[in-house]
Amino acid sequence: MSVQGKRLRALYGATLLSFLLGSSLAVPVAAAEEVTTDEEVNTDAGGSAADATDATPNWQETTLSGDWGGSRKRLYDAGVQADLVYSADYLRDTTGGLKRGGAYMGHLDLILQLDGEKLVGWRGGSAYLQLISNTGGRVNLNHVGSLMGVDNLEAPVNRTGIFKAWLQQSFLDDKASLRVGLYPIDSEFYVTDSSSVFLHPSFGMAAEVASFGSLAGPSIYPTSSYAARLRIDPDPAWYAILAVVRGIPSDRIATAGPNVSWQKGSGSMLIGEVGFSPAKAGLLDDRPTSEEKDEFEPISKLALGLWRYSPRFPELVAVDAGGEPLLATHWGAYVLAEQTLWRVPESNRDLAAFLRYGFTDGKTNTLDYSFSAGLSFRGPFAGREKDTIGIAATRAHAGSQGRAQLSAELGQPLSSTAETAVEMTYRAQLAPGVALQPVVQRIFNPGLALPNATVAGVRLQLAL
């Protein structure tokens, strides 16, 4: 490796670890939501409390092990649902970045969901436990050098531990719920279903929120923190979510894995989101079919989010007359939209698009804004209704203070002010519980100072 390459790798080591903590779980839409199978009941997937009362999951069609001879159905009827998913990625940097090379990354996800009313008569009560285990290497940290990351399974270190553990109480006829416990914000905030097929982390939790500020960062994959979350669904077309979450200290990002953050002095994050579904409000002709009974559910969502941390954070490079860092509020906002654009008549096959934009104060962390857009087609071919194909792009821009800090640490000017990633992928459902997903990414200006990189690989996912 050249001298410049070694310097770049040393410089971006800490920075990359910060952004890697923004990886999300398909096992991790943020590593947690994509682990679920198509018909799995998941009260943590962002729906209202009433959504958790849907039909019994069809394990024969969505898992390798099926119904366990009827045992899974009996457990479900008693109020217990268990799911185990293993995902394995192999990605390789073929050109550009830090250096050529690849890495395997594995992720095991065990989810246990409990219905309080069925188990102990706790009306409106539920519990959720998720354990995760990471194995393998780090293709972005060691080979690509992207600020945003390239794979939503990659974590700074390999560990096994608790990721989610919360209790929930629903009330107001299931139109509201209060959730308390270990809670990652990427399970419900900044979520677009049509982007969940992609492997790039920024199509889960966006880069400007996932990046750590000068003092602390968010509770997201792979490190969670304790929180209290209130959700209100006054109407099927509207929802509002508000959460107060303990921050993850920035001084431990290099060692943070899938474990719990209890450290004091890291501040707290307040985040809120309001969303609206034009389709559920009856504003769109979302069911172009002659059948009276149509189970097709179009993707349709508009949302606005706001977040801020307390206390105030030190600015990255700005100082006062005495040479002490200036303090500023670490905050941001985002808007998102996704919508089914076209549906194959008389089917569940559809083309959807998403668009997301978010910005920050630009003083207390590297990025000041990012945006992403893409298309995904569920059931692109006749007879392949469970497959999904997609193409998407995301761009993250570094603010003036972020660029100044990176340039000073590197000892030379940066080659760009922004990093852009484009991804194409095809997720093929080969059998019940078995999916294979090839992917190609092109990373422009990785790390704002490295040659453009091309990344290719494949994901294997097994729902057991």
Where are these regions (language model features)?
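N-terminal periplasmic/intermembrane-space "pro-region" immediately following the signal or transit peptide
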Residues: 27-89, 93, 99, 117-121
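Transmembrane beta-strand segments of Gram-negative outer membrane beta-barrel proteins
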Residues: 54-58, 72-95, 127-131, 137, ...
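Short loop/turn motifs that connect adjacent beta-strands in outer-membrane beta-barrel proteins
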Residues: 66-82, 115-127, 172-175, 237, ...
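Outer-membrane beta-barrel pore domains and translocons
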Residues: 87-91, 132-134, 183-185, 245-247, ...
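Outer membrane beta-barrel
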Residues: 101-249, 276, 365-405
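Signature for the C-terminal beta-barrel architecture of outer-membrane proteins
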Residues: 211-344, 348-351, 357-360, 377
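Outer membrane beta-barrel transmembrane domains
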Residues: 258, 273-276, 305-327, 343, ...
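Outer-membrane beta-barrel "beta-signal"
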Residues: 452-464
